[in-house]
C-alpha cells in the first residue's frame, strides 16, 4: 500500500544507496498503486479522499533533499478546498494541522516555521470560499491557543482570520479573537482609572500613571467568590510585610 511505499522510500534514502534504478522502481510502483486506487474508487465518496491524499511522486530521479523539498511543495497540489465531500469530514483540518506542525524547517525556530507554514496554508486555499477559510483558520487558531502558542494564534488572527470574520460579520468570532489577544501574555494591559487611598485622602489616577514602584499586583475579585474572600485578606497582610 501507499504507507509501505513511503517506508520504502525513507529506507532507501536513509541507506544512502546510489541505486537509482531501484528508486525509480519504487516510484513507479507507488504511482501504479495510486492510479489503481483512484480507478477502483471512481464514482464513490472515497475518490475525493484518495485524489486529495495523493503524495508527491517523482517522474524522474530525485535525491533526498530534492524529494523532501518537493514533498512539501506539492503537499496541497491535489487538494480541492471547495470539495463538499472533503468539507464534510475532518480531512482538510487534519491536513493543514499536519502541514503546519509536521513540515517545519530545522534551520528555523519552531515559531518561525509555524508562521511560514501558515502562510503556505493560506496561499494553498486562496480559491476556497470565505466560509471555508474562516472555518479552517479558526481550527488552526484554536489549536495554537490550546497549546499556549499565543503569539502564533494572534498571528493567525491579525494576518488573516480577524479581517475575514469582520467581513463575514461574525461578531461572536471577532469578539473571541479580540478578547483572546487582549488577555494574551505579553500584551500591554488596557489603561483604566482607579482610586488610591492613604489615610483619609482618596485620589484618582490611572494604571498608566503608577510609577512609584517597580512592580504592582493587580487583583480582580468578587465578594461572591469564596476563594477571594479567603485569600484577599491574606494578600493584604502579605503586601504589608
Labelled PLM ranges:
Residues 1-201:
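Oxidative protein folding and maturation machinery
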Residues 203-235:
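Short active-site neighborhood of thiol/selenol oxidoreductases, capturing the structured segment around
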Residues 241:
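Thiol-based oxidoreductase modules, predominantly thioredoxin-like and allied folds used
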Amino acid at each position: 500500500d501507499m504507507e509501505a511505499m513511503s517506508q520504502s522510500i525513507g529506507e532507501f534514502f536513509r541507506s544512502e544507496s546510489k541505486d537509482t534504478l531501484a528508486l525509480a522502481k519504487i516510484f513507479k510502483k507507488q504511482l501504479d498503486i495510486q492510479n489503481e486506487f483512484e480507478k477502483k474508487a471512481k464514482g464513490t465518496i472515497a475518490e475525493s479522499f484518495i485524489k486529495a491524499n495523493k503524495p508527491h511522486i517523482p517522474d524522474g530521479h530525485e535525491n533526498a533533499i530534492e524529494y523532501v523539498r518537493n514533498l512539501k511543495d506539492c503537499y496541497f497540489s491535489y487538494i480541492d478546498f471547495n470539495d463538499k465531500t472533503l468539507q464534510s469530514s475532518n480531512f482538510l483540518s487534519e491536513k493543514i494541522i499536519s502541514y503546519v506542525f509536521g513540515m517545519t524547517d530545522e534551520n528555523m525556530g519552531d515559531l518561525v516555521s509555524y508562521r511560514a507554514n501558515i502562510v503556505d496554508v493560506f496561499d494553498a486555499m486562496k480559491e476556497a470560499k470565505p466560509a471555508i477559510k474562516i472555518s479552517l483558520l479558526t481550527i488552526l487558531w484554536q489549536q495554537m491557543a490550546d497549546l499556549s502558542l499565543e503569539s502564533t494564534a494572534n498571528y493567525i488572527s491579525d494576518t488573516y482570520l480577524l479581517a475575514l470574520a469582520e467581513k463575514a460579520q461574525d461578531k461572536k468570532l471577532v469578539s473571541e479573537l479580540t478578547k483572546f489577544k487582549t488577555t494574551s501574555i505579553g500584551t500591554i494591559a488596557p489603561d483604566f482609572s482607579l482610586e488610591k487611598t492613604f489615610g483619609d485622602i482618596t485620589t484618582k489616577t490611572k494604571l498608566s500613571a503608577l510609577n512609584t514602584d517597580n512592580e504592582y499586583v493587580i487583583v480582580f475579585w468578587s465578594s461572591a467568590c469564596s476563594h477571594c474572600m479567603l485569600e484577599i485578606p491574606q494578600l493584604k497582610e502579605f503586601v504589608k510585610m
